[in-house]
Swiss-Prot record:
GO cellular component, one term: membrane
Keywords from the named record: ATP-binding, Membrane, Nucleotide-binding, Repeat, Transmembrane, Transmembrane helix, Transport
Major location category of this protein: membrane
Subcellular localization: Membrane
Topology of the protein relative to the lipid bilayer: Multi-pass membrane protein
Domain of life: Eukaryota
Domain named ABC transmembrane type-1: residues: 107-390, 774-1061
Transmembrane segments: 111-131, 143-163, 215-235, 240-260, 776-796, 816-836, 887-907, 909-929, 1003-1023, 1029-1049
Family: Belongs to the ABC transporter superfamily. ABCC family. Conjugate transporter (TC 3.A.1.208) subfamily.
GO biological process: culmination involved in sorocarp development; sorocarp morphogenesis; transmembrane transport
Protein name in UniProt: ABC transporter C family member 13
Lineage: Eukaryota, Amoebozoa, Evosea, Eumycetozoa, Dictyostelia
Length: 1350
């Protein structure tokens, strides 16, 4: 028989597979929602979901193409606009009130179902009362048809109540999705509008936490909690009225006990709410730190600071768990009180009733059934109330976020007609980063900035160290938080239309603040600003999306192939595209992790150029490229394709100043502006500035004669030496060969960087549960907890047996007090075991939650860089936010429900079979059917949950990227496009919720029908039982079992669904780690392999590369090939080459950020692959190209391990010209800095990173474009500081500015991953046709030409 069933199943599977998969190109987005076209019967039974369920069961795991569209009323586009009418005002809880008014009360169907459900709740006890009376009749008084009629009534009464509950859940679900979608989208849209001051109050991590945790609590509550608060009081009142009718005024005693328990329940609920609010606060901080940790993971690894950050996160986790544990304790007390109340109600009611009445079967068991029906509302009402109270903190957090200050929607007068002067203007403009402290700004009414010109002239010409210490703006003594805000007070600015305006000034002078004022990113307090409608803006730190290079350039604009090709050529990107596997369709990693700094800047510039805007505002777009490329970009982009547009260029590269039509010199928020000749006439001496950066090679050339070098010193035979420069390559490449409308899908797939998020298939494996219990304590301890649960429930079941005995007075000669006494004993034992079981389970789940997070954090924290390259930060943060939140807040209740309901069902079945053995056969059939239905449901339910988790990651990834690129997105007016993208992501995620809830109802209706059938069969077989007491006991047990069986099945499946979070975390816990953190002496490997690493290593600083080859991925082309050279102790090596040549890879290979695929690197004769990563990285020093500043004090950013004294820190700050800046801050070294160093300029961040390295005083130091964001004068002073402080160190300097490395001991020229030249600067200069000599000649000729222009 089973073989035949399998054959049928196979045929169905094949047929279904063909019918569903025959059109593989089907667009699942366009599949209509089957509910909307379903018949009344299909809607009543939720049969419209069966296509998807059967697909999953017969064909295998369901795919996204099997999931239909959402109903229109659930889509974000429909629900989000409803929130437009919310008025926060001065009312209490405005958000909750608004949701109740606009999402709950307007749903008339749900209110009708609430009333219907309350009415049906008393139907089953009434039917039972008359059935018991019938059972107690003598045989002569009974007829089969009458008995059958009562059985049918019991079936109808039971099923009607449970069916109405299903629709109660259904309408609640729709409200939940309305609220989830609307609030999630509203938070994202609010983030797009946040002002600079508003944005500082929230990080991307805390906003993610709002959506994952707080909005999750909203969705959970408005799924059913909001209706429970309405229906439970009605239900309790109706059932109590029925109880009083059955047992008289004795029922009021029980009611009185309930009333007394409510304030205590409310107290516990408020305590739970308070502790939840506190835990959410620490959860926010934890998520912020985790987000910061993931975003800065490369820098933390380079500094060997992972453990420091992990400890900071763990401390916040410890505080979060402290309050979560308190919440669990109060939850246990609340559960104990609820269950104890039920027992006390029974004891008190029957004790009082027995005084004047005899306990009869119809009275006792009808009362018990009423109490069974009362048990859920009595237990769940306090839970619903404290869930509402717990929602209040989340509501306040969401309200606070939604009320943050926004950017000014109309801060400017946009000109688009000839009547308005089309120059870009600021008239008497006063700007501030924080719009909440206008009093901080003083308006002196001085409209003439000429009074400042002498001071600026003095600062530009004089180059003393003291005068060029970096400064910030005036600080308000009354507000310690204003130090980071550059103040622009009463300024006048002009950028002539169709002309080039260059803005220059020292580090921290206010250049970025000025352009931020032009695009509306800082608050305009007063004045007038004229800007065009369409502006392209490039930030100093390039913003790139995790998508293809082409999409980053198009940035939402339509493809114009001819213009696109011109942009690629103008931005010198053709040679870079030629090296990429899928050309411009190659996927760029998050924040452009697989690109060099110069490539990122050129892509950002290409985006601005392609947009074809009225005005281009470019903030330091040339700092990360070599001088030749910078000149090309200036001539072909800024002065080429942009030539007829208004251009505002912020730059430190003053060689371009003579080409400017208008020049603005900024110093400390003050402006002097005019043409070049006008500024010269005012005394601004640009010639002296230019002379500070001229390459000083004349003396070196005079000291040595030109000579031909030995082949051993210079790699003349290297074919790469003969290759063209980037500019020449750009000219020679046929652009049509690399840019095309036709694409090779195989190449595109191969070039993908991000890996697809894994989705497990099938049931949650036992290994996931074992892993959970192992982290909780042990599997044995959990089994012991289960035993206590079953023992506790066995004692509770004895109370029903005892009541049955009491009602029939089977023990002759015993008074009611005897029965009451032992009834109380059973209740007391039950309460004791109740306490034990809850605390045992709390220990398991709480320990698991704590240890899983620790394991996850350590696994991710010490994972390889490739892991972060291929997994977007949003996906990783999803584990730390949503998945951890589900484990923290849900698994305890789910395990408790499953064990409680499961043990109740087991004992109920045992009782029914014991009383009526004949029921065993139909029970077996029903159990088989039950199991089939559960299996059909479980397959799709698991897959939907897994897809829900996966579709959540794009929401967080987009949110993270949007937060990082807010300025760029707003300047390009791309908000609507990103809003639309988020709407799509949220709708897809809601779709998984919708169909997951729908199949919940599908199984619910069927299980409730089978449960009602169980009641019918139990009642039917009891008709043939001569023992009335046992017959009634079996029927009441069956009625009680229905509720618990269905709840057990639902909660078990929900538990399995939520264990998906454990499964997802476990997959990350098993992430391969980088390698050993510490060096291990292993004598077993032999003396030749032993590492003897002392504390002073490296003491010499000798470095040797031996045939090094490095690949970022096993399948990718090598980034470094056959690299062999030696660096002597105390040598200063300059590493040059075009952008993307492999310079940074050479540097970071010393830190083993990428392991050598071939060859080895030795420092002081020791192969660094044998050195622990922490030992290696902590022994080296680095100043990275993109500075990393994390949230915390300035002291913590400079000296996180508290190793140095204040005086040592101040000396380091003085050496990098930051002492006066930091000392002007109110709290000095204890001043708090926001994530990413908001409030500090790019150059200041670089200098702060430099101070860390100076303080560390390592023997080997890597400088990776460490001064690219610093003006030349400050750069010269920093260069002198480096020579003084690192004179006895081995230093590798990666730079595009040749003046930075011209005094190096040797120069290494890298091109296409190979070392093509390596010698002293003078030898390379004197070598005919050397690449370095060409670079020097180019810059020298360029500077000479510029000096003529000056």
């Amino acid at each position: 028989m089973f073989e035949r069933i399998n054959k049928i199943k196979k045929k169905i599977k094949e047929k279904l597979s063909y019918s569903i998969l025959k059109d593989e190109k089907i667009d699942y987005y366009n599949l209509p929602c089957p509910e909307e076209s379903a018949s009344f019967l299909s809607k009543l039974t939720f049969s419209w979901t069966q296509r998807m369920l059967m697909t999953g069961y017969f064909r295998g795991p369901i795919q996204m193409s099997d999931i239909c569209d959402l109903p229109d009323d659930v889509k974000v586009q429909k629900t989000n606009p409803i929130l437009d009418d919310i008025d926060f005002g001065n009312s209490k809880w405005p958000l909750l009130k608004f949701i109740y008014t606009n999402f709950v009360t307007k749903n008339k169907k749900s209110i009708f179902i609430v009333i219907l459900c309350a009415i049906f709740s008393i139907l089953s006890p009434l039917c039972l009362k008359y059935f018991i009376k019938y059972i107690q009749l003598s045989k002569n008084e009974k007829t089969f048809l009458t008995g059958l009629g009562y059985c049918v009534l019991l079936f109808v009464g039971t099923f009607s109540y449970t069916l109405s509950q299903q629709f109660l859940y259904w309408f609640g679900m729709r409200t939940s999705l309305h609220v989830r979608g609307a609030l999630s989208q509203r938070i994202y849209e609010k983030m797009l509008k946040l002002s600079s001051s508003g944005g500082k109050k929230y990080s991307s991590g805390s906003i993610m936490n709002l959506i994952s945790t707080d909005i999750g609590l909203f969705a959970d509550f408005f799924w059913i909690g909001h209706l429970e608060i309405i229906i439970f009081p009605i239900q309790i009142t109706a059932l109590l009225a029925l109880l009083c009718w059955i047992v008289g005024w004795s029922g009021l005693v029980g009611f009185g006990v309930m009333i007394i328990s409510l304030p205590i329940n409310t107290f516990f609920g408020s305590k739970m709410s308070k502790n939840l609010m506190l835990s959410l606060g620490y959860s926010d901080t934890r998520c912020n730190l985790t987000s910061e940790f993931i975003n800065g993971i490369r820098f933390l690894k380079l500094y060997a600071w992972e453990k420091l950050f992990l400890d900071r996160i763990e401390e916040q986790r410890r505080l979060q768990l402290k309050y979560l544990y308190r919440r669990v304790i109060f939850a246990i007390f609340e559960k104990m009180l609820s269950q104890t109340t039920n027992a006390v109600v029974l004891v008190s009611t029957f004790s009082v009733y027995s005084i004047n009445n005899e306990i009869e079967l119809s009275v006792a068991f009808t009362a018990i059934t009423i109490f069974v029906n009362l048990r859920q509302p009595i237990m769940r009402l306090p839970e619903a109330i404290h869930n509402l109270l717990g929602l209040i903190p989340s509501a306040k957090r969401v309200e606070s976020f939604l009320q943050l200050s926004e950017i000014q929607t109309q801060p400017f007068i946009n000109f688009n007609n000839k009547s308005i002067n089309d120059d870009i203007l600021i008239d008497n403009g006063t700007f501030n980063w924080n719009q909440d402290n206008d009093d901080y700004i003083t308006n002196n009414g001085d409209n003439n900035n000429n009074n400042n010109k002498n001071e600026i002239k003095k600062r530009l010409i004089e180059k003393s160290e003291e005068e060029y210490e970096t400064t910030t703006t005036t600080t308000d003594d009354n507000n310690n938080n204003n130090y980071e805000s550059y103040l622009l007070n009463n300024i006048n600015f002009k950028a002539p239309a169709g002309k080039l305006t260059i803005i220059c000034g020292v580090v921290g002078s206010g250049k970025t603040s000025l352009v931020s004022g032009l695009i509306g990113e800082i608050y305009k307090v007063s004045g007038r600003v004229n800007t065009p409608n369409k502006i392209s803006f490039t930030t100093q730190q390039s913003f790139l999306l995790s998508t293809s290079l082409r999409e980053n350039i198009l940035f939402g604009n339509e493809m114009n192939l001819e213009r696109y090709k011109k942009v690629i050529e103008a931005c010198c990107l053709a040679p870079d595209l030629l090296q990429l596997a899928a050309k411009d369709l190659t996927e760029i990693g998050e924040r452009g992790i697989n690109l060099s700094g110069g490539q990122k800047q050129r892509i950002s510039l290409a985006r601005a150029l392609y947009a074809n805007s009225d005005c281009y505002i470019l903030d330091e777009p040339l700092s990360a490229v070599d001088p030749e490329v910078a000149t090309h970009l200036f001539n072909h982009c800024i002065q080429g394709m942009m030539n007829d547009k208004t251009r505002i260029l912020v730059t430190h590269q003053l060689q371009f100043i003579p080409s400017a039509d208008h020049i603005v010199v900024v110093d400390n928020g003050k402006l002097v502006q005019g043409t070049y000749s006008e500024l010269k006439s005012k005394g601004i001496d640009f010639e002296s500035i230019m002379k500070t950066k001229k390459l000083n090679i004349d003396n070196q050339q005079q000291q040595q004669q030109q000579q031909q070098h030995d082949e051993n010193e210079i790699i003349d035979e290297n074919p790469m030496k003969k290759s063209n420069s980037l500019i020449e390559s750009n000219k020679l490449i046929n652009i049509d060969e690399i840019i095309s409308d036709k694409h090779d899908s195989n190449l595109i797939e191969k070039a993908k960087l991000l890996v697809k998020e894994d989705k497990s298939e099938g049931a949650i494996g036992l290994h996931v549960y074992r892993e959970y219990f192992k982290h909780g304590s042990s599997t044995f301890f959990f089994i012991a907890t289960c035993v206590v649960y079953f023992f506790s429930q066995a004692i509770f079941q004895m109370t029903d047996f005892w009541l049955s005995t009491w009602s029939q007075h089977k023990l002759q000669g015993k008074s009611d007090s005897f029965y009451i006494f032992y009834y109380i004993i059973f209740i007391g034992l039950f309460i004791v075991t109740l306490v034990i079981r809850y605390f045992m389970l709390a220990h398991v789940t709480f320990s698991a939650s704590k240890n899983l997070h620790t394991s996850l954090l350590n696994s991710v924290g010490f994972a390889s860089c490739q892991f972060f390259d291929t997994n977007p930060s949003g996906r990783i943060l999803n584990r730390f936010s949503k998945d951890i939140a589900e484990i923290d807040l849900l698994l305890y209740d789910l395990f408790s429900d499953v064990l409680y309901c499961g043990s109740t069902v087991v004992f109920a079945i045992c009782v029914m079979i014991y009383i009526s053995p004949l029921i065993s056969l139909p029970f077996l059939v029903l159990i088989i059917v039950y199991n089939i239905i559960k299996n059909i449901y479980a397959v799709s339910s698991r897959d939907l949950k897994r897809y829900e988790s996966i579709t959540r990651s794009p929401i967080f990834s987009l949110l993270q990227e949007t937060f990082n690129g807010l300025v760029t997105i707003r300047s390009y007016q791309q908000q609507n496009r990103f809003i639309s993208m988020m709407q799509d992501h949220i709708n897809i995620n809601l779709r998984l919720f919708y169909y997951s809830f729908s199949i919940h109802r599908w199984i619910g209706v069927r299980l409730e029908f089978i449960s009602a059938l169980v009641v019918f069969l139990t009642a039917f077989f009891s008709l043939f039982n001569s023992n009335a007491g046992f017959s009634v006991l079996s029927v009441t047990t069956a009625i009680g079992m229905c509720t618990y069986l269905n709840w057990a099945v639902r909660q078990f499946v929900e538990l399995e669904v939520k264990m998906n979070s454990v499964e997802r975390i476990e997959s990350y816990i098993n992430t391969p780690k980088e390698g050993n953190r510490f060096t291990i002496d292993n004598e077993e490997e032999g003396e030749e392999n032993m590492i003897n690493l002392n504390e002073k290593w490296p003491s010499k600083g000798e470095i040797e590369f031996r045939d090094v080859e490095i690949r970022y991925r096993p399948t990718s082309e090598p980034s470094l090939k056959n690299l062999s050279f030696k660096i002597n102790s105390n040598d200063h090596i300059g590493i040059v080459g075009r952008t993307g040549a492999g310079k940074s890879t050479v540097g970071i290979s010393l830190f083993r950020m990428v392991e050598c695929s071939k060859g080895s690197i030795l420092i002081d004769g020791i192969d660094i692959s044998k050195i622990g990563l922490h030992d290696l990285r902590s022994s080296l020093g680095i100043v990275p190209q993109d500075p990393f500043i994390f949230s915390g004090t300035i002291r913590l950013n400079i000296d996180p391990f508290n190793k140095y004294t204040d005086s040592e820190i101040w000396v380091a700050l003085e050496k990098v010209k930051l002492k006066s800046t930091i000392s002007s801050m109110p709290l000095k070294l204890e001043t708090m800095i926001e994530e990413g160093g908001d409030g500090l300029s790019f150059g200041q961040k670089q200098l702060l990173c430099l101070s860390r390295t100076i303080l560390k005083n390592s023997k080997v130091v890597l400088m990776d474009e460490a001064t690219s964001g610093i003006d030349y004068v400050t750069g010269d002073l920093i260069k002198q500081t480096l020579l003084e402080n690192f004179n006895d160190c081995t230093m590798l300097t990666i730079a595009h500015r040749l003046d930075t490395i011209i005094d190096s001991t040797k120069i290494a020229v890298v091109d296409k991953g190979e070392l093509i030249e390596y010698d002293t600067p003078i030898n390379l200069i004197n070598t005919k046709n050397s690449k370095f000599s060409k670079l020097v000649k180019y810059q020298t000729d360029f500077h000479k030409e510029n000096e003529k222009n000056f």
